[in-house]
C-alpha cells in the first residue's frame, strides 16, 4: 500500500460520522495474533441447584462450542460452578470475555441455544438488576409482572422491536442481542420499575421504526410524533413545619418539674406506711369501680326511660305569622288596579 492510500484511509477513519451504529467493526482474525496468549485466563461463575440437571445435559455441547474458539470449559457439580479457560491455541483475546458472559447467562436460566449467540461479534448481553429499584415487595412483583404482560405479550413485543432475547428471572432481567437493542431494553426495564408503563416505550419504538422509513423526516425532530407520558399521581405538597412560639427571654433557668416524691409529699402520701398506702389504693379502686358501675347502669336504663311529652298548651295550634293579612297593602293594591282600568 502506498503512502497516499494510507493517508486517505486515516483521513476517512477520523472524519465525523452521522450514525455511529452504521459503522462496521473490523474483524479480528488469527493472523492478527499469531503468537496466541501469553498466560492462561479463566473465569468462573456459580449456578443454583435447580440448574444442575439442565447444565449436566447440555455440557458436552458447551464444551464443543467453546472448543471451536480454542477454549476449555469445566463443570464442577460439587461446588456448583462453571469455569472457562484459555488454551495455548487461543488467539482471540476477547473471546474469554464472551464465554464468561455465556456461562453467566446460562446460570441465570437462559437456554444454551440462546446463550451461545453471545460468542458472535455483533451480539452482546446485559444483565439488569431490578431487585433494589423498588422498596416494597408487592410493588416490585406488580411492576415485574407488568414487564412480562398478559401471557408474555409485552415481553414478546419488546423482543420483536429490539431484536433481543429477554428473560425475566427473579431479581434480574437478562437481555441478549445487538448492542443498540440492549440499550433500548435497559431503558424500558428501568422506566418500568420506576412506574412508567412499558406500553409508552413500545409505542415510541414502533413510531421510530416507521419514521426511519421516511427519508424526508430523517433530519427532523421526532419528539412531536412520540407519545408523552403524564404522571397522574400528584405528590402532596410538603407541609411547613409548625414552630412553637418562643416565650419571653428570662435569664433564669426554668423551674424544675415536680418529681414523684414531691407529689407524694404535697399529698401527704409519702408519710403513710405500707398498709395505709394499700388501703388508700384499694379505696380509690373501689370508688372508681362504683363510678363506672353507675355510668353503666345509666346507659342500660336509658332505653327504659319514658319519653318527655309536651304540655297541652304547647300542643295548641298557634296562628302562624304567614296567615296574617296586611290590610293597608291590600287596599293600595286594589286602588292601583282600579286606576289602571
From Swiss-Prot:
Location within or outside the cell: Nucleus, Nucleolus
What does the record list as coiled-coil region(s)?
A: 271-341
> Which positions fall inside the KH domain?
126-194
Organism of origin is: Drosophila grimshawi (Hawaiian fruit fly)
Q: Does the keyword Nucleus apply?
A: yes
Annotated InterPro entries: KH_dom (IPR004087), KH_dom_type_1_sf (IPR036612), KRR1-like_KH1 (IPR041174), KRR1-like_KH1_euk (IPR048550), KRR1-like_KH2 (IPR048548), KRR1-like_KH2_euk (IPR048549), rRNA_assembly_KRR1 (IPR024166)
Name the PANTHER family for this protein: HIV-1 REV BINDING PROTEIN 2, 3 (PTHR12581), KRR1 SMALL SUBUNIT PROCESSOME COMPONENT HOMOLOG (PTHR12581:SF0)
Per the record, the gene is: dbe
Which biological processes are named by the entry's GO terms? rRNA processing
UniProt function note: Required for 40S ribosome biogenesis. Involved in nucleolar processing of pre-18S ribosomal RNA and ribosome assembly. Binds to RNA. Required for female germline development, cell viability during eye development and for survival of dividing cells and epithelial cells during early wing disk development.
UniProt key word RNA-binding:
yes
What is the name of the protein in this document?
Answer: KRR1 small subunit processome component homolog
Keyword list, A-Z? Coiled coil, Developmental protein, Nucleus, Ribonucleoprotein, Ribosome biogenesis, RNA-binding, rRNA processing
CDD domains per the record? KH-I_KRR1_rpt1 (cd22393), KH-I_KRR1_rpt2 (cd22394)
The signal peptide, as residue positions, is none
Please give the Pfam families that the UniProt record associates with this protein: KH_KRR1_1st (PF17903), KH_KRR1_2nd (PF21800)
Amino acid at each position: 500500500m502506498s503512502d497516499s492510500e494510507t493517508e486517505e484511509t486515516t483521513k476517512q477513519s477520523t472524519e465525523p460520522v452521522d450514525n455511529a451504529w452504521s459503522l462496521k467493526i473490523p474483524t479480528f482474525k488469527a493472523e492478527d495474533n499469531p503468537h496466541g496468549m501469553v498466560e492462561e485466563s479463566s473465569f468462573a461463575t456459580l449456578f443454583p441447584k435447580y440448574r444442575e440437571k439442565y447444565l449436566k445435559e447440555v455440557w458436552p455441547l458447551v464444551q464443543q462450542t467453546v472448543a471451536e474458539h480454542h477454549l476449555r470449559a469445566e463443570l464442577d457439580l460439587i461446588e456448583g460452578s462453571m469455569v472457562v479457560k484459555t488454551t495455548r491455541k487461543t488467539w482471540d483475546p476477547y473471546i474469554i470475555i464472551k464465554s464468561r458472559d455465556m456461562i453467566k447467562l446460562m446460570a441465570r436460566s437462559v437456554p444454551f441455544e440462546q446463550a451461545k449467540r453471545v460468542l458472535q461479534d455483533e451480539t452482546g448481553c446485559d444483565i439488569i438488576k431490578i431487585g433494589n429499584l423498588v422498596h416494597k415487595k408487592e410493588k416490585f412483583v406488580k411492576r415485574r409482572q407488568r414487564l412480562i404482560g398478559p401471557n408474555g405479550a409485552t415481553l414478546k413485543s419488546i423482543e420483536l422491536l429490539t431484536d433481543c432475547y429477554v428473560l425475566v428471572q427473579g431479581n434480574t432481567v437478562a437481555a441478549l442481542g445487538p448492542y443498540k437493542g440492549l440499550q433500548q431494553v435497559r431503558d424500558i426495564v428501568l422506566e418500568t420499575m420506576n412506574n412508567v408503563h412499558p406500553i409508552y416505550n413500545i409505542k415510541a419504538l414502533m413510531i421510530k421504526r416507521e419514521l426511519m422509513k421516511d427519508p424526508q423526516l430523517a433530519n427532523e425532530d421526532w419528539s412531536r410524533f412520540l407519545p408523552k407520558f403524564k404522571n397522574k399521581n400528584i405528590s402532596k405538597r410538603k407541609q411547613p413545619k409548625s414552630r412553637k412560639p418562643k416565650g419571653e427571654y428570662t435569664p433564669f433557668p426554668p423551674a424544675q418539674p415536680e418529681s414523684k416524691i414531691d407529689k407524694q409529699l404535697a399529698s401527704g402520701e409519702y408519710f403513710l406506711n405500707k398498709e395505709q398506702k394499700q388501703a388508700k389504693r384499694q379505696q380509690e379502686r373501689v370508688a372508681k369501680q362504683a363510678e363506672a358501675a353507675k355510668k353503666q347502669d345509666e346507659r342500660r336504663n336509658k332505653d327504659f326511660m319514658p319519653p318527655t311529652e309536651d304540655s297541652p298548651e304547647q300542643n295548641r295550634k298557634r296562628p302562624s305569622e304567614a296567615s296574617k293579612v296586611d290590610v293597608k297593602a291590600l287596599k293600595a293594591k286594589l286602588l292601583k288596579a282600579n286606576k289602571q282600568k
